[in-house]
Amino acid sequence: MENAISTVPEFLPALPEILLAVGAMALLMYGVFRKDCDARETSLGALALFALVGAFLIIEPNAYVETFGGMFVIDGFTKFMKLLILLAAAAAIVMSLTFIRREGMDRFEYPVLIILATLGMFMMVSANGLISLYMGLELQSLSLYVIAAFHRDNTRATEAGLKYFVLGALASGMLLYGASLIYGFTGSVQFGSIATVLQADGTNIGVIFGIVFVLAGLAFKISAVPFHMWTPDVYEGAPTPVTAFFAGAPKVAAMALILRVLFVAFPSMESEWQQIIVFIAIASMVLGAFAAIGQSNIKRLMAYSSISHMGFAMVGLAAGTPEGVRGVLIYLVIYVVMNAGVFCCILAMQRKEGYVENISDLAGLSRNQPMVAFMMAMLMFSLAGVPPLAGFFGKFYVFMAAVEAGLYPLAVIGVLASVVGAFYYLRIVKIMYFDEAAEPFIQPMPGELTAVLGISGVFTLFFFVYPAPLILASQAAVRALLP
């Protein structure tokens, strides 16, 4: 008994993760034992669980705490990232309520899988060693593989799930190989110990190879070039609310992990990993911008858009400074909110025969549904980085960090990629406002989509009026990561 009491403090820092795990199991049992349980019931349970976990995270102190032998850490940075992940996951569940019922996916397991994926993301964000990193990554990935193929009767969804699984397994293998190299050359799996060893002994070629493989595995999770090949097919084939989830929360978790790995485990090797990050950032920005131009399916276009946006976020990471990390965090928040709004508009693209996904189907939307068209146009301008919308400030902070760090060519390439990207965003605005009206969509938009779209639109439009809370919160998170 005494032993059990002494272990209680070990578990307290991980209470949000424990709540998610217990909640997922409880909802799973509720769905199994209650006859005719549908996704709406378990979705409401999942949202209540997210609210409880979010409340705990908000009242939790910002102190730095390590537990489970130093493999699990909580601080102000993990709190910031976990709240953003919760926000993205909750939005994905809310956006899917009407869709899953209309598309014959109304099964109680759907929200449970999102909870389990969120649990994996929480573990990734709090990982303080290579083993806990891999555990969190795999828990997230296994849930996402199943969600991608959740619409069993749809061959595109099944194909998307299979592609994601095969390529995800390859990326996990690369990450694990890199982790084994790092462990072999440093003798430790804990980030702090790895940093200490490298500080004392200096760098060697084996550790550099290890970093390359670990970054390859993590770059896959944020769809960064050249590990982006799965993204367009999976985004197009997966059910639309699932695509909205993929485009938000997993990217936040993987970016948090990249930040912690590079700045906590390998600060002494900044000159080595900075070159890799600069290459990935340039390749992602340029390929994402040019590849999206020829797309006719709006979900494929959003896939290439997400590749490009992760490239922009990595510009701040490449700077290797506290200002750069702050820029990354602000960029991620703005990106997640804008993304949720765009996918609400995509989910409103429904006719009598079902959901449509072609960009040409938006023709004349301004005459049929002027409010939806206005919101979509505003979000497109924001994604393009037009001031004074939120998207402009996201890019401004990461480009300024790159300039202050002396990475002038990277900042210039980023600005040019933004100009190219503006073309395909503005093409959507042109189609909505100036093309001949197509057959109108079913009206009105479901209430839950209207709510998420409204929040996204207000944030995007009025962010410039009062950006201080987000800037201060991101600065506090950066101070926790880089004391």
Curated annotation (Swiss-Prot):
The chain crosses the membrane at residues 13-33, 45-65, 80-100, 111-131, 165-185, 205-225, 244-264, 276-296, 301-321, 328-348, 373-393, 407-429, 452-472. It is found in: Cell inner membrane. The keyword Ligase does not apply. GO terms for biological process: ATP synthesis coupled electron transport. It comes from the Bacteria. InterPro entries: NADH-Q_OxRdtase_suN/2 (IPR010096), ND/Mrp_TM (IPR001750). It catalyses: a quinone + NADH + 5 H(+)(in) = a quinol + NAD(+) + 4 H(+)(out). The keyword Cell membrane applies. It is a multi-pass membrane protein. One of its GO terms (molecular function) is quinone binding. One of its GO terms (cellular component) is plasma membrane. Keywords: Cell inner membrane, Cell membrane, Membrane, NAD, Quinone, Translocase, Transmembrane, Transmembrane helix, Transport, Ubiquinone. Belongs to the complex I subunit 2 family. NDH-1 shuttles electrons from NADH, via FMN and iron-sulfur (Fe-S) centers, to quinones in the respiratory chain. The immediate electron acceptor for the enzyme in this species is believed to be ubiquinone. Couples the redox reaction to proton translocation (for every two electrons transferred, four hydrogen ions are translocated across the cytoplasmic membrane), and thus conserves the redox energy in a proton gradient. NDH-1 is composed of 14 different subunits. Subunits NuoA, H, J, K, L, M, N constitute the membrane sector of the complex. This is NADH-quinone oxidoreductase subunit N. It comes from Parvibaculum lavamentivorans (strain DS-1 / DSM 13023 / NCIMB 13966).
